Regions:
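Phosphate/dinucleotide-binding and metal-coordinating scaffold of catalytic cores
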Residues: 1-174
C-alpha cells in the first residue's frame, strides 16, 4: 500500500525436537549425549552454566533442560568441553591423535565460522551453539542463528583477543 511501517526481523527459536535440532533424549543414567551447549556471553543469567579454567569461557547448558539434567551429566559435559578448550590452546593443538580434532567436528566448525564471517555477524564469537550426540566424542557446531547483528547491522566486534580489530569489516589478527 506504499505506507512505510519500519523494518521487520523474522526469527525463530532453536528447539530440540524432530525435524529441528535432533538430539537423542537421555535417561538419567546416560552420560555421553545428547547435549546442546552454548558459548554464551550472558551465561551469568542462566541457571545451568560453567566456566572454563583456561580463559574463563562462559558456557550454558541448553539441553537437557534444567529440570532434567543430572549432576553427573552436568559434570560430564563440562569436563568434555574443557578437554576441547585445553586441546585448542595446547602446543599440540593440530596433532591428529591429541589435538582439538578429537573433540570437535572440523567441518561443522568451518561452516559455522565461514557463515559468521561472510555475514559479518558479531554474535558468531560470543553466542556459539554446539551439540554432542550419544557415543560421539566430537562437538558439532550449529545451528547458526541470531543474525540480528549481521550484514552491517552492527559495526562493532567482540574481540577474540586484545589484538583483534576490524579491517575493511573483516576480522584480522595482528
Amino acid at each position: 500500500n506504499g505506507d512505510y511501517k519500519g523494518c521487520y526481523q523474522l526469527c525463530d527459536h532453536i528447539d530440540v525436537r524432530k525435524n529441528r535440532v535432533e538430539i537423542e533424549e537421555m535417561s538419567s543414567g546416560d552420560l555421553t549425549g545428547g547435549y546442546m551447549i552454548e558459548i554464551d556471553a550472558y551465561a551469568d543469567a542462566e541457571p545451568k552454566k560453567f566456566y572454563t579454567k583456561l580463559y574463563n569461557i562462559p558456557v550454558t547448558i541448553k539441553y537437557p533442560d534444567d529440570d532434567e539434567i543430572t549432576y553427573e551429566q552436568e559434570n560430564y559435559i563440562a569436563s568434555h568441553f574443557i578437554k576441547l578448550t585445553t586441546a585448542v590452546y595446547s602446543s599440540g593443538y593440530s596433532d591428529p591423535a591429541n589435538g582439538f580434532g578429537q573433540y570437535m567436528d572440523i567441518e561443522t566448525f568451518l561452516r559455522h565460522f565461514l557463515v559468521g564471517e561472510y555475514s559479518g555477524n558479531t554474535d558468531t564469537y560470543w553466542s556459539v551453539r554446539m551439540t554432542k550426540k550419544k557415543d560421539d566424542d566430537k562437538f558439532n557446531f550449529g545451528p547458526v542463528w541470531d543474525f540480528d547483528l549481521a550484514f552491517e547491522n552492527d559495526r562493532s566486534t567482540y574481540p577474540i583477543n586484545e589484538n583483534a580489530k576490524l579491517t575493511n569489516e573483516w576480522l584480522c589478527m595482528q
